[in-house]
């Protein structure tokens, strides 16, 4: 373990991966390092918490480090409140150092206050609570199989080849730094169904409501087949109508989209002609969902484009009220936390 201070001799090797919105390919995820010092900045904002600290080095001096935390909802589930950790606190931070030793920008896993011993993980890793199965898709779900250590989730999709000349030109010009999310332009439907954080499905007689954690996003699916109103204003979520087939598959059809940056896929925009069909099939045990979406858009696609994924059921929890996305924070990782 790299020695950054005297307390680094007590460093703990950790095999768990850090998974959040941005790629973790820049960090050494095979073990944690301990950083000891005084916080100079605590930014409680979305999509990520950020910290700066003057960290003790092995030469008897200090270096300024930046640390990227998780999102607010994960921190709250881990036991944090905004006022718990402040600038001026002396702390021990467990985190993943940068692969480039010259870059003083690390991924925070846990921060401990030396004055009180209070410890705050980036996310709650220890809760063991009973998970109740779902009978009708209701409940709280998270995406499975998402591991952004390699950065593959943040590249242009390799399987997207059915592109018009306009779509191909956009893919050829792809650069991840142009991701609209880094400017707080949210991920549109249906791409958003395979994003990070949790989803809560709530059923009533006429609608299915899908709440998206972290983004304050609330979709309403009209299960009664209600037609799109004449005065409906197109947006990134569109107008959705749903039904449950005889085999139990939930079908959601959506139109009424506005033109959206990267609305088809990473690197490919969408037009007002975009249409989508989502399919959800509940596992027999009620603890998993097989999901997919198919997009058509004649402006950018020559044929339908389908993406598949999986959800797992988790114990229900409250989605905390969160501040809106901060563009300065959303792009801060591009500047190594500066």
Residue spans for each PLM region:
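Preference for short coil/turn "hinge" residues that link or interrupt alpha-helices
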Residues: 11-12, 20, 73, 78
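Bacterial N-terminal signal peptides
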Residues: 5-16
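PEST-like low-complexity, intrinsically disordered acidic/proline/serine-rich tracts
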Residues: 25-338
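Boundary at the C-terminal end of the N-terminal hydrophobic targeting segment
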Residues: 17-25
């Amino acid at each position: 373990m790299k020695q950054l201070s005297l307390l680094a001799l007590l460093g703990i090797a950790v095999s768990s991966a850090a998974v959040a919105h941005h790629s973790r390919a820049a960090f050494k995820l095979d073990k944690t390092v301990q950083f000891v010092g005084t916080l100079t900045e605590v930014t409680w904002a979305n999509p990520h918490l950020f910290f700066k600290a003057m960290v003790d080095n092995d030469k008897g001096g200090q270096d300024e480090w930046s640390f990227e935390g998780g999102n607010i909802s994960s921190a709250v589930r881990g036991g944090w409140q905004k006022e718990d950790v402040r600038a001026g606190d002396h702390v021990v931070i467990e985190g993943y150092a940068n692969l480039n030793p010259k870059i003083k920008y690390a991924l925070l896993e846990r921060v401990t206050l030396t004055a009180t011993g209070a410890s705050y993980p980036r996310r709650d890793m220890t809760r063991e609570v009973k998970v109740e199965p779902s009978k009708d898709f209701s409940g709280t779900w998270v995406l499975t199989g998402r591991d952004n250590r390699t950065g593959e989730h943040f590249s242009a999709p390799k399987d997207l080849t059915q592109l018009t000349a306009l779509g191909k030109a956009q893919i050829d010009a792809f650069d991840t730094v142009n991701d609209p999310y880094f400017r707080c332009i949210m991920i549109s439907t249906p791409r958003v169904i395979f994003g990070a954080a949790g989803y809560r499905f709530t059923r009533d007689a006429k609608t299915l409501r899908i709440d998206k954690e972290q983004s304050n996003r609330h979709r309403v699916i009209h299960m009664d087949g209600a037609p799109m109103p004449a005065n409906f204003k197109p947006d990134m979520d569109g107008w959705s109508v749903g039904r449950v087939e005889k085999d139990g598959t939930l079908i959601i059809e959506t139109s009424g989209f506005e033109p959206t940056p990267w609305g088809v896929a990473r690197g490919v925009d969408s037009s007002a002609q975009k249409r989508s069909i989502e399919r959800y099939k509940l596992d027999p045990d009620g603890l998993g969902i097989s999901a997919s979406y198919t997009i058509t858009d004649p402006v950018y696609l020559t044929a339908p484009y389908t993406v598949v994924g999986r959800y797992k059921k988790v114990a229900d929890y409250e989605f905390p009220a969160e501040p809106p996305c901060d563009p300065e924070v959303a792009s801060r990782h591009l500047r190594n936390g500066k």
